Amino acid sequence: MRDRFTVRNKVVTESSAKLDPDLLFVYGTLRRGLGLHHHLKRMGAEFVAIGRVQAEIFDLGEFPGARKSGKPGKAVEGELFRLHNAEKTLRVLDQVEGISARNPGRGLFERGTVEVALPNGERRLAWIYWFR
C-alpha cells in the first residue's frame, strides 16, 4: 500500500507551484499543543491540514530543526496553517525564531518556502522556518 503522504522527488519552481503567502508549514514547537503554538493561536492562524515536506529533521535539544533534503524518502510531518494577517504574523514569528531584519543570516533559522504534500494528494507551496 502506498503511503498517502509520499513526497516525490521534484524540483519546485515558480512554474510548478505558486506560493500562497498566507500558508505556513510548522514541524516543531509551533505545532498545536506545543510550547510556541500560542503565537499562532493569538494571531488567529487557522489549522488547514497535516502535511509532509521533503526534508530531514534534527534534534537540537529543546526543539527540532528541519533542512531540505534531496534524499528520496526523507520526509518531515507537520501542520499547515492559514495566516489571517500573514505579514504581521510572520514578523512576530521571525522574532520568535530569532530572525533579525538588521542581521539576516545570523540566527539558527531562516524563513523560506517548501512544497507541502497533503493527505488528499494536493500540493501547496508555503512558508517554513528552515534550520541553517
PLM region spans:
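Glycine-aromatic micro-motifs
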Residues: 2-132
